Curated annotation (Swiss-Prot):
SMART domains the UniProt entry points to: RuBisCO_small
This protein's name: Ribulose bisphosphate carboxylase small subunit, chloroplastic
Subcellular location: Plastid, Chloroplast
Entry coiled-coil feature ranges: none
Disulfide bonds: none
Pfam families linked: RuBisCO_small
Note: The basic functional RuBisCO is composed of a large chain homodimer in a 'head-to-tail' conformation. In form I RuBisCO this homodimer is arranged in a barrel-like tetramer with the small subunits forming a tetrameric 'cap' on each end of the 'barrel'.
Family: Belongs to the RuBisCO small chain family.
A GO term from the CC aspect: chloroplast
Amino acid sequence: MASSIMALSSTAAVAAVAAPSKTGNSNVVSAFTGLKSMAQFPSSKTMSNAGAEWEQKTTSNGSRVRCMQVWPPYANKKFETLSYLPRLTPEQLVKEVEYLLKNKWVPCLEFEEDGEIKRVYGNSPGYYDGRYWVMWKLPMFGCTEASQVLNEVNECAKAYPNAFIRVIGFDNVRQVQCISFIVHKPEYN
């Protein structure tokens, strides 16, 4: 009995799905045309006072969507946290490294002459795709002063003047990289 009811209900469902629509092609979705402006929503004249207050407090970028631009990726290398800013002064570098040490992160230096992510040896991401830079010496376990880190930065910059140098802060308890920022750029960049 139950199986015959199941058979009847399943054939009815298939028939309903297979039946053509009388209004034409009603299941076609229109193409995405971007964000809409607030003009098609009800105006504050028809809304209550609470709705008008809410409308005044909110913002919409609907009218500005066509003004958005993409950051130019060519001849404009941007890397880590502070790379969009001008070069950091020595005082700013000291503050960044002190912040790293205050959080008990282990500083480490890495350098790379090209600095671009490139996949030369295959299409899949891996060790040789440019994300992993060469480590300068060993991570500075037990480092307590920013001057120690900056001395290593200066040594690395003397040895490799045409390289990008970044400081990385590792949390050895959680075993993750917590901070990374460029401390030296080649003169041509």
